[in-house]
């Protein structure tokens, strides 16, 4: 009886040892352009959001902004996947109505302005498969220059006169996108 107990104990210990290796996980390092989110109202205690955007934050890392975001080409507006913007109520971009729901945000940078594009495409990697036919709304807004420089591409919502403003910033470039109710 002692012999069978010893064999059983060894068998259980061996099985446990093997299962430890089988359950070991290999997790990837932090992405070079980490994902972030911005919402309005931006108080985390406020559950009734109007809009939320999920995007990736590329870094300049000594590179010129013009290398990373060329003028005259549709840009994914960040890194990796194009940003997904969710409106929890009907809004407007310019005079175009945007129904509550999820969309993709693209931009078309030019020298003194940038065209904001809301597309019905979802789960889009980059801007490689962008189709103008799927645009829901477009608005050309001016680009301004700030005194301070942002290393990481950033987005934040603020309160506007008649709705919400999506502020985009990278390097010294600043853009204010008005969404109205």
Model-derived features with residue positions:
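Bacterial Sec-dependent N-terminal signal peptides
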Residues: 1-27
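Mid-length scaffold segments of soluble, non-membrane domains
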Residues: 75-124
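Weak global preference for isoleucine
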Residues: 6-12, 50-53, 85, 98, ...
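Alpha-helix boundary/interfacial micro-motifs
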Residues: 12-21, 106, 111-113, 118-119, ...
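Primarily secretory-pathway and cell-envelope proteins
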Residues: 23-76, 124-181
């Amino acid at each position: 009886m002692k012999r069978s107990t010893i064999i059983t104990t060894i068998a259980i210990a061996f099985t446990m040892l093997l299962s430890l290796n089988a359950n070991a996980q290999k997790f990837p390092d932090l992405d070079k352009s980490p994902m972030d989110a911005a919402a309005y109202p931006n108080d985390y205690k406020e559950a009734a959001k109007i809009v939320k955007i999920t995007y990736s934050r590329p870094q300049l890392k000594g590179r010129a902004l013009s290398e990373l975001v060329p003028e005259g080409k549709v840009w994914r507006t960040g890194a990796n996947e194009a940003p997904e913007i969710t409106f929890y109520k009907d809004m407007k971009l310019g005079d175009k109505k945007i129904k509550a729901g999820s969309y993709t945000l693209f931009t078309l940078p030019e020298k003194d302005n940038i065209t904001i594009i809301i597309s019905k495409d979802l789960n889009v990697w980059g801007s490689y498969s962008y189709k103008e036919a799927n645009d829901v709304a477009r608005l050309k807004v001016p680009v301004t220059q700030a005194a301070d420089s942002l290393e990481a591409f950033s987005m934040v919502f603020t309160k506007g006169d008649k709705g919400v403003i999506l502020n985009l910033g990278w390097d010294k470039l600043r853009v204010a996108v008005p969404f109205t109710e």
